[in-house]
Amino acid sequence: MREILHIQGGQCGNQIGSKFWEVICDEHGIDSTGRYSGDTADLQLERINVYYNEASGGRYVPRAVLMDLEPGTMDSIRSGPFGQIFRPDNFVFGQSGAGNNWAKGHYTEGAELIDAVLDVVRKEAENCDCLQGFQVCHSLGGGTGSGMGTLLISKIREEYPDRMMLTFSVFPSPKVSDTVVEPYNATLSVHQLVENADECMVLDNEALYDICFRTLKLSTPSFGDLNHLISATMSGVTCSLRFPGQLNSDLRKLAVNLIPFPRLHFFMVGFAPLTSRGSQQYISLTVPELTQQMWDSKNMMCAADPRHGRYLTASAIFRGQMSTKEVDEQILNIQNKNSSYFVEWIPNNVKSSVCDIPPKGLKMAATFVGNSTSIQEMFRRVSEQFTAMFRRKAFLHWYTGEGMDEMEFTEAESNMNDLVAEYQQYQDATADEEGEYDVEEEEEGDYET
């Protein structure tokens, strides 16, 4: 049925991705050899083919493509707990590395490897009954996930124009920087994602650190803890595809409900309940509690504060046995109480869906996906750092040396600034200013604000 093809690229993407597969295997009762060992077969196996192919001998193989320009991360996945579950041919890697250089990932090293990746993608897509879309895990600060990741997305876009393209993109953090050239890599990537992706879930390490530190009370969070948060959200977004629920959603329904204008498809995500290990027993999980926490700005997995902007749209995905009526009441309640944080020219702009099966170890849980104009803070911050370096042409020789042109940087910069301006325009728009926005969104959005 409605299959999703999962692709992970670069070190960050592969680490998030392998954590995601651990979570999904756990939810569906698949052990590390790919065999089913769960307890509720009818629920866990009914729609297992969203993420798995069934191989001979009753083994379930993830529909995943793993790519990287150096073998390191792949080797550690292979030797990790779920390393044997993946199809060996689906590991595609080079030896050279992209050295945190977007141009290497997009134009030189990545371009050499891309055909091998596309062959595997085609093979997996041909095995599907009715492919729904692709989900890509990558970071935007490095070279492989950002450069080669966006190259792959644009190639897939060419070949499968009518399939959904969902990305989980880790943005550079405001205070924590891994690489000096992050602003370049991120800006060049956003330039691609605006055009070629349908939905982007925006994540960043700093916000995830804050959640681990403040909410989960972990004194020294590891990347594993951060990736666990991300994978909880990833599994939440697709849970109503994988389990029977009362109010279903799929990638396309999500997009239709969340994207009022085609370029504004960068979402904030959150998850509830997040509790520290010690305090779990003192917390009663009720729909109001979940709702309260999932709309909390401290819960957002990217460094933008939803209180600084307004929600164009949002989607709440609840999991567990609960009354749909109560869910609807709570969502309505949030909208009425905080009406100033929602744009008034899209009435009822929160979609909810309910799925019966909660995540492992919880009675109920909720995943939040919001399209808020405050996401522009992320872009604005990266853009300022980009401009500071680009004005002096710092580090540019690494990119031009791989055959890039300065013009491409200028274009990416202005595209990102246009995006910020568009978000700002709709943040300021009110329901009664009809005359001003007759400009059709189809032109590339370069009008003055």
Curated annotation (Swiss-Prot):
Pfam families xref list: Tubulin, Tubulin_C
Cofactor names: Mg(2+)
Key words, A-Z: Cytoplasm, Cytoskeleton, GTP-binding, Magnesium, Metal-binding, Microtubule, Nucleotide-binding
InterPro entries in the record: Beta-tubulin_BS, Beta_tubulin, Tub_FtsZ_C, Tubulin, Tubulin/FtsZ-like_C, Tubulin/FtsZ_2-layer-sand-dom, Tubulin/FtsZ_GTPase_sf, Tubulin_C
Biased composition (Acidic residues): 430-449
Record-listed GTP binding positions: Q11, E70, S139, G143, T144, G145, N205, N227
A biological process term (GO) from this entry: microtubule-based process
Localization per record: Cytoplasm, Cytoskeleton
Region (Disordered): 427-449
GO MF terms, alphabetically ordered: GTP binding; GTPase activity; metal ion binding; mRNA binding; structural constituent of cytoskeleton
Residues involved in Mg(2+) binding: E70
One GO CC term on file: chloroplast stroma
Family, similarity comment: Belongs to the tubulin family.
Subunit structure: Dimer of alpha and beta chains. A typical microtubule is a hollow water-filled tube with an outer diameter of 25 nm and an inner diameter of 15 nM. Alpha-beta heterodimers associate head-to-tail to form protofilaments running lengthwise along the microtubule wall with the beta-tubulin subunit facing the microtubule plus end conferring a structural polarity. Microtubules usually have 13 protofilaments but different protofilament numbers can be found in some organisms and specialized cells.
Misc: There are nine genes coding for beta-tubulin.
PANTHER family: TUBULIN
Function per UniProt: Tubulin is the major constituent of microtubules, a cylinder consisting of laterally associated linear protofilaments composed of alpha- and beta-tubulin heterodimers. Microtubules grow by the addition of GTP-tubulin dimers to the microtubule end, where a stabilizing cap forms. Below the cap, tubulin dimers are in GDP-bound state, owing to GTPase activity of alpha-tubulin.
Protein name: Tubulin beta-5 chain
Species: Arabidopsis thaliana (Mouse-ear cress)
Gene assigned in the entry: TUBB5
